[in-house]
Amino acid sequence: MKNQDKKNGAAKQSNPKSSPGQPEAGPEGAQERPSQAAPAVEAEGPGSSQAPRKPEGAQARTAQSGALRDVSEELSRQLEDILSTYCVDNNQGGPGEDGAQGEPAEPEDAEKSRTYVARNGEPEPTPVVNGEKEPSKGDPNTEEIRQSDEVGDRDHRRPQEKKKAKGLGKEITLLMQTLNTLSTPEEKLAALCKKYAELLEEHRNSQKQMKLLQKKQSQLVQEKDHLRGEHSKAVLARSKLESLCRELQRHNRSLKEEGVQRAREEEEKRKEVTSHFQVTLNDIQLQMEQHNERNSKLRQENMELAERLKKLIEQYELREEHIDKVFKHKDLQQQLVDAKLQQAQEMLKEAEERHQREKDFLLKEAVESQRMCELMKQQETHLKQQLALYTEKFEEFQNTLSKSSEVFTTFKQEMEKMTKKIKKLEKETTMYRSRWESSNKALLEMAEEKTVRDKELEGLQVKIQRLEKLCRALQTERNDLNKRVQDLSAGGQGSLTDSGPERRPEGPGAQAPSSPRVTEAPCYPGAPSTEASGQTGPQEPTSARA
């Protein structure tokens, strides 16, 4: 144990970061811990004696609990020391194993011991197995073991060498046979050179393989040494854990004895508590009888209140049926209004912009009314939910006897609020009915105006057609007159001797192309010009389409 404690101290010096805050595990520390636990128990003893008039049983319990705590703390410390030393050694050995797999062979055992001394300033500790030191790497026992391993390797190699010699003899005979087949010495030399080159390549490959195998062998030797060290550490940890288990068994026995004593004391306390509990039960029974008398009176009052609530619920159901009928009537009116709106939309598609604006305004009002109807439906659902809540409250009212008066007052207030809301809703329904009636009247007036205007448009179209016919007849007459004037002007140019009186008819003949435009306007004071009449033709259909 002392050698292991020294090893733990050296490991903590080499790796102070791996176990911060842990106490140093040395021979002196291990000897001082029990001595420190004993004064703690002694310190508790006089303190308990100085306490003012404590019972002797309580003092004994405190002393036993303090001693058990000290023992448990000491055992936990020992366990932490074992785990810390073993885990620290494993952490130190882990990176070496990883590095040995991918790197070349490390220096020999002498160099390892030197590096250990350079790091810690102490010689490498020798592990202890079952109270005896394990032989170090430089001891003669280990050298004998290695020599025996080498002798076994040689014995294993001899049959392999014999097999190789037999194989070489066969190859030589085959080579001689091939050389005998050749006729000239030059061919024999060439064959030998080829064979020699092949053997050289094989020899080089074998040397490379030998180097790789040697590296692997050195790595395996290092791993073997490392595993031996870990095995020794595991054996030491096992021995320490066995000792700890024994101490824990002793500690468990003492805990069992304490548990038995506490159980006896608790039984005595339980008997005292039962006697006190019976006395309190008798008092409670007397109080229960008094409360039963009060509860009987409260039940009668609650029955009367329940009858009143039933009457209120029946009245509320009747009012609900009336509201349902009103809503059905509203739905039917809404359907009629929707049908009328569809007809009005079909009729108003061909109206002018003013009619279209008024129609949009009416449609907006209809949408708002629908929205209000939906809000009314939502309020209806909300009222139904409130009714369900009131029924649940009524059931709770029967269960809770003490809070019956408060619940009844709150229910009355809520019923009054509901009646006020219903009155408000009825007023709103009357308002919306009046609005719907006004909108229907406006729609009927618009339809009558449209029919009147359609009749006026038909009369105007008939007048326009008559005017167009008259204009066409006038245009034909004008064309005939123009032709006659042109003929007359052509006959007048032949006689150059004619003077002023013969030139007068040429004036209107020369102005004839421009005169018809002037003559068209006074012919029909009520009719428009030809250009205007030409434009009115396509304009009227557009107005009709609108």
Curated annotation (Swiss-Prot):
GO terms for cellular component: cytoplasm; cytosol; extracellular region; membrane. Residues 186-491 form a coiled coil. Ubiquitous, with much higher expression in heart, kidney, liver and pancreas. Belongs to the taxilin family. May be involved in intracellular vesicle traffic and potentially in calcium-dependent exocytosis in neuroendocrine cells. GO terms for biological process: B cell activation; exocytosis. The modification Phosphoserine is found at residues 72, 515. Residues 70-80, 143-158 have a biased composition (Basic and acidic residues). Residues 11-21, 530-546 have a biased composition (Polar residues). Binds to the C-terminal coiled coil region of syntaxin family members STX1A, STX3A and STX4A, but not when these proteins are complexed with SNAP25, VAMP2 or STXBP1, suggesting that it interacts with syntaxins that do not form the SNARE complex. Residues 1-170, 482-546 are annotated as: Disordered. This is Alpha-taxilin. Keywords: Coiled coil, Exocytosis, Phosphoprotein. The gene is TXLNA. GO terms for molecular function: syntaxin binding. It comes from the Eukaryota. The keyword NADP does not apply. It holds the Pfam family Taxilin.
